[in-house]
């Protein structure tokens, strides 16, 4: 899309390029005070920007879109587009007096479109709920914007977006009109890729989608210009015509199956491997890659050579011309001419000059001995070929466009972008420039554009090494100047006279000069036209008219550059053909007329006059005798390198001319006498010649021809100073001389001939005086012009010197100010550096202190955790060892009793039970010690105590009475309220890593023995709490009623007081105590008072009824045993009452015979309550005795749960 040759959006009518409103930006330098005053006057709010117009400038195809798309574009501008950031930049630049940067860039537009598409895709709406037309419009704009940027990844993404549009249109039938936009966008993408054939096919598909409909949706917004298309179909036809012309215009390969047809032009691509160029008589140029030409020739013209195409019909379809030239290029800049056909009706070029001269000299000889007649009338173009092309014009255009133009653009660029600012901007826009210049132009004379933009060793980029194309690219990408009215990719209209438009036009002429003009040359008319346009551009850019005149007037030798300097200006190596052309000019080889006669100048003035712009007069030569062959030979000898025979003829001519010049310099009083003598001698000589030999006639004709040829040369050298009347006079002289040859030597004829000869000499003298006068006049004018130029140069130099002095003083002041600023900054930096060092030292010392503290605290924490675990271990082992000692004492006592009574089964069962308890306690001691030691070792290794699993404290041993009943094989009897319970004192769980007691019951430590696990009072959890998430709330009134039943001798108030004391002693709550535990605690509180009341009643009984003891002779003598039996009976009666009225401890509801279950330990529960408890816990909720369920051990007697 960056090619200047692509003009897809420009109409063929030149009036279309002109717009009614001219936007000419003039930057005037203003003083600082005036700028400050303007800053105060400018309002804070930026002026509104026409968003649609800015988008049209960036995306040119929008102007050709149908009317039905623009509502969606306006919706995008109103809802999803914002110019706030751009307007701030515009306001800032306008306040600073700089040129305003374009309000919209292609990158910013692509970013906005991406955000809008992302918002639509992020919504969770269905395809029927979103605005499909708006979504398709955004996809189309995004694809066209990516096509405008024309990167490789952008082309792939644009192709995907157009494919998404096609899929969405096929799914929703309401947006079929957008299908033409899909093919239109794909056609634009193909054009950007130089794939014009594919683009043409896509445009035709878009045209087919529209069909013959008259829908207003496809109309284009009306404009003032009547030549612009009014419908989208007309716009497509214009694109089709432009694409067809580009297929022929662009120098791309004409082979249809060429794989590289989508690449850049052949002449502009520096990586091609050779090409062929065919030109016909109608100036059609067709290009083929070298490989493609071989394939094409073998396919359609097998066995034919390249020279066989000479004279054949043009390969371009519809062209009636014939092939006249074929070029082959293997290396860039070196062209080989395979064949070239020269026709009589064509102009002679530099290449076919030799062939034309040979054709002229190969005329057949005639036997007629007739004196040749010379016709000095001007000739037409069709009779004798003349020179059409002059590469002198080419080099003058090369100098003014590439050398002078590049210098002017560099000067403007340096003023707007100094080297320091340029380096900063290049670093900012490095990502933007890298895809264009990082891998191109590897054969650049200075190493490539990327090497120039980003030189090594952190040097500043030098703009004096930038060529014109690179300067244009930097102006475009760095936003140095505003974009032209139609953007950077379109040819600016004639009404656009901005700097950016002129620079763009200058680059266009550069491309034309190095492609078309270099290959085909140009005429004088084309040279004058291009010179006028380029001069206007350079004058607007700031170049002086005197410098332009100097370039045009000076010869090539004075303005030529060497090979290396010209390579820097061109940006690429100078082609070989240009080098050969320059060498020819520098050696002094100039174009000559077709007659081949050498110009012999009388004075040095004639050479100077010829170098400026010598006109070429055209004459027709009628060849009718053998004398013409002699003339042609003389011409050939003079025009080419002189041989031995031609040297003599040239000397004779020079002697004749020297004699003639001497005669002209004689005084006027001797002219008549000399003319009479010469006339007499001439007449006598003619009589002798006519009488003796015919050869003398040839000599005379040669003499006359020499005079006439001198007259022709002099007239040509005098820039047409010899008028047509003078030529008629010469013609009359020749006719008179020829008439004299045919007379019979009469005296009248002799006199007539003498007068004519005298008239001829006088005319010649007149011309000599005219030449001298014009020479003096020209030299005087030249001196005056030189004086004026020198004065102008002196004035300009004085101005430059004054400007340089002012600038130097200003720069010196700036240098001093910068030095002071640098010094202040250095002082501030040193001060801050010292502060930073102090802060760094303080921070390092603080960090070191805190690290030491952290290490000390870590070691202390480790030691504390180890000590904590050791204390826990020793405390737990201490109580277990005390339990072990008590158990051993009990075992020794029971063993002693069993030894004294060997037949007692009760004592044997007691011995076995105490042995099992001792073994269980010892296993628990070993297990606890092992677990604590393992945790201590892990803490020492670095593990945190909070991350370690809690230590499981073993439960206390079961009750010995239960074990005795199990060993005896009897059903268990409910344990007494006054049975002592062996428990391990529990420790408070201070550390989160240790749990005091296990919630789940552990398996028995000895096989074959079922252990009961009475829960400690402080940590007992009610069974219902295990089944339910909330703790069991005991009904206060129900507990009081049951205590009244258990202790009938106590009043309700006394039982309430005892229960309140028990609640206070257990943390204001008895929710964790079972009913048996509550009864046991209350009995311990009632026992002291009961003993006191019994003593009082005993004393009263002994005194009141003394015969009471005698009535019972069988009573035991021990009061304690009696008391015990009475207690047992009382307990038995209370148990019977409790068996009838005791509730279920799980749900605290009354028991009924229908759903009653009794465990082996004689505790009763509801069947629906105890079964879930046993499935989860496996122990009795009251005594913690391990119970086997029938499902686990069907044959075991303890697994039966009898029902009452």
From Swiss-Prot:
Q: Compositional bias of type Acidic residues: which residue ranges?
A: 1132-1141
Renumbered to this chain, the Polar residues biased-composition regions fall at 1099-1126
Ranges of compositional bias, category Basic residues:
659-668
At the top of the EC hierarchy, this enzyme's class is: transferase
**Span list, region Disordered:** 1-22, 640-681, 1088-1141
Stored InterPro entries: DZIP3_RING-H2_finger, HEPN_DZIP3, TTC3/DZIP3-like_helical, TTC3/DZIP3/RBM44-like_helical, TTC3/DZIP3_dom, Znf_RING, Znf_RING/FYVE/PHD
Which residue stretches does the UniProt record annotate as biased composition, category Basic and acidic residues?
Answer: 649-658, 1088-1098
Query: Which Gene Ontology terms describe the biological processes this protein takes part in?
Result: protein polyubiquitination
Annotated RING-type zinc fingers sit at 1144-1184
Under Enzyme Commission nomenclature, its number is: 2.3.2.27
**Pathway the protein acts in:** Protein modification; protein ubiquitination
Coiled-coil region: 746-861, 906-941
Catalytic activity reported: S-ubiquitinyl-[E2 ubiquitin-conjugating enzyme]-L-cysteine + [acceptor protein]-L-lysine = [E2 ubiquitin-conjugating enzyme]-L-cysteine + N(6)-ubiquitinyl-[acceptor protein]-L-lysine
User: What name has this protein been given in UniProt?
Assistant: E3 ubiquitin-protein ligase DZIP3
Q: What are the leading ranks of the lineage?
A: Eukaryota, Metazoa, Chordata, Craniata, Vertebrata
